[in-house]
């Protein structure tokens, strides 16, 4: 921890913000104090989360410890468990986080990394209906980092990604592609 805060102190006035990402940051013991210390240094904080801890999410937002939240929507509710490798996954915490963020308590975005083996056309409409009215939604092109639990995963072409975005825009007009050239 000292290393992190030393780094941030040296860069005050140079950097504007810090992105706290994971794994899942909200699972960490002491995350609130960590965020408080970053805030004391004057940084804005973006939190990347999968939405599994809605109560902690609400707490850090209401305490003013985060300025922006980016939440992963792994897939449609029907295929969420398959996508994360846990069949019959209980989505109730994810659902609570979605509802909370949609209340506009903090600027936020939802995002989905689109993987050909997990996402079909019907999933995009289902996700869109689920997060309808959201501030921002990003469909991100999957990139194989070579360090995946499951090998052989592929991305869609630019054309298919654009078609998916069009489906979603009916429900979430501010839908944008990321990582697609």
Language model segments and positions:
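Conserved AdoMet/S-adenosylmethionine-binding subsite of the radical SAM
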Residues: 2-17, 26-161
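A C-terminal junction/extension of Radical SAM enzymes
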Residues: 162-181
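Active-site beta-strand/loop signature of hydrolases that rely on acidic residues for catalysis
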Residues: 23
């Amino acid at each position: 921890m000292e290393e992190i805060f030393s780094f941030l102190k040296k860069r005050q006035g140079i950097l504007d913000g810090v992105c706290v990402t994971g794994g899942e940051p909200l699972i960490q013991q002491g995350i609130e104090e960590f965020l408080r210390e970053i805030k004391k240094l004057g940084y804005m904080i973006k939190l990347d989360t999968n939405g599994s801890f809605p109560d902690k999410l609400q707490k850090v937002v209401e305490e003013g410890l985060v300025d922006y939240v980016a939440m992963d929507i792994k897939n449609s509710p029907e295929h969420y468990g398959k996508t994360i490798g846990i069949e019959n996954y209980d989505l109730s915490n994810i659902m609570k986080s979605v509802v909370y963020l949609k209340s506009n308590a903090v600027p936020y975005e939802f995002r989905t990394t689109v993987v050909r083996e997990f996402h079909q056309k019907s999933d995009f409409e289902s996700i869109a209906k689920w997060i309808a009215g959201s501030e921002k939604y990003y469909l991100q092109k999957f990139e194989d980092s070579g360090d995946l639990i499951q090998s052989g995963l592929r991305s869609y072409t630019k054309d298919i990604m654009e078609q998916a975005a069009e489906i979603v825009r009916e429900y979430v007009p501010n839908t944008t592609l990321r990582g697609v050239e």
